[in-house]
Each structure stands twice: as C-alpha cells, then as structure tokens.
Amino acid sequence: MTVDEIFSELAAHMIKGIMIHDQMSSYYDFLSLCGYQKCHEYHYWCENASYLKLKHHYFKYHNKLIKEKEIENPNLILKSWYNYTRSDVDISTKRNAVKSGLEKWMDWEKETKLLYEKMYKELINLNEINDAKLLEDLICDVAHELSQAETEYFNIKASDFDIEYILMEQCEKKEKFKAKMKGDWK
C-alpha cells in the first residue's frame, strides 16, 4: 500500500466510525437510555476530532488532500424501529437492544484496532515514522475505548442484562460523559 492509500483507508474508516457513534447515540436516545446516548455522543465528538487531526496531519506533512473512498452506511438501527415510538419499547426489547448495541460497539472497536495496527505496520515498512506515530496514538485511543466497551459489556452481562441495573446507571453515565464533553475531552 502507498501512503495515499493508507490515509484514504483510514479516513473512510473514521467517517464510518463517526456514523456508527451518531447512530448508536440515536439508538440509545430512542430507548431512553441517556447514559449510553451521551457515551456515544462523546465518542462521536472524539472520532470527529481524530478525523480532523488525521486530515490536518496529511495536509501538513504530505501537502495533499486525502482521496475519498465510498463509505457504506452502517445502518445500525433496525428498519422496523422506524415504525414505533419510544412508548412502544418494552423491557425485553430494551434489554436485548442493550446487549446487541454493546456487542456491535465492541465489534467495531476490535475491527478499528486491527485496521490501525495493520496500517501502522504498513507505515513502518514504508519508513514513514512520523505518520506511524500518529497511528500509534490512535491505536492507544481505540484500545482504551475497546476496554471501556468490554468492561461495560461484562458488567452488564454479570447482571444477566438486568433492566433495573441498566436503568440505575444511566444518570451517572450521562453526567460522566457530559462532564467529559465540557472539559478537555480530546
């Protein structure tokens, strides 16, 4: 792969990540789970910041625009959900949606980490150390986010996805991510 191809691949993946966190934010907002909604809103803004940093890095050190690639819409929200209102969501649906949403989040972060590691190796092989350093930072960020997602999943799984447990933690999560968004969040 060339440096241009690597950055094009990274940019497309980041844009898809922005779309995923936007959709997950809407997903949890629809389910009236404000803590998870705010978590994904926070990660949406972090992904945007990382994407802008990637573009700026490329402009600054390669003096070019990143070539755009076609990006597939992740469509994380089931089409059938668009026929319902929040009041139509029962406990069983909410419980299953939390499990599914957390699994999708973990899968995405695992995929992202693998891609970043692969691109890092490519850049090292091309002796593009400055570019690789940028990827090294992104790998650390995504490893941390994956750890958060897995911890959340395993904690809730330990409660057998108990809806009371899930609901009880929403206010605290909302305030945590709200504070992160007000502070130095990136």
Q: What is the role of each PLM region?
A:
Residues 1-186:
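Iron-associated oxidoreductase/ferritin-like identity signal
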